[in-house]
C-alpha cells in the first residue's frame, strides 16, 4: 500500500512505525526532486482582479497579515506554532503537530513571493488535467507581487 499525504498525517504514520517515506515534499531537497522547485505555491491568497480593484486596502491588510505570519515563522519554534492554533488542529497530540511543523517549515516561503520556478512547478503539477495542460496560461499574470512587496516595506 502507498499514500500521498501531508503532515500531520505523515508524521503520525511514520512516528507510529506504520509507514516510511519514499519521497518527502516537506524539505527543500524533496520539493526540488519531486517538483523541480524549492517551494510550491499552494497556501497563497487567492482573489479575483475585480476584488483587488474594488478593495485595495482590504487586500493589502490580508497580505500584510500573511507576510507578518511568515516573518514570525522565521523565529517561532514548532511549539510556538502549536500554541497559536486551535486544539482541533493537533487533535489531542501537540507533539506530533509540532513534529509536523518542524518537518514542513523549511518549505515555507520567507518572502511571500512566488518564484518563476514555483509558478512553472505549480503549472506542471496541475497539468495532469488535460484542460489545464492544453490551456495557454500567462504564468507571469497569475501571481501579483505588488502587495507582498508593499508589505515588506512596512
Model-derived segments and their meaning:
Residues 52-132:
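Secondary-structure end/capping motifs
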Residues 48, 115, 144-148:
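Residue-level signal for threonine
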Residues 120-154:
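Conserved C-terminal helix/tail region of periplasmic/extracytoplasmic solute-binding proteins
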Residues 17-18, 113, 153:
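Intrinsically disordered, low-complexity regions
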Residues 1, 18, 95, 130-139:
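A local structural motif
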Residues 32-35, 109-110, 145-152:
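Short, solvent-exposed polar/charged micro-motifs at secondary-structure junctions
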Residues 1-86:
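Pocket-lining segment of extracytoplasmic ligand-binding domains
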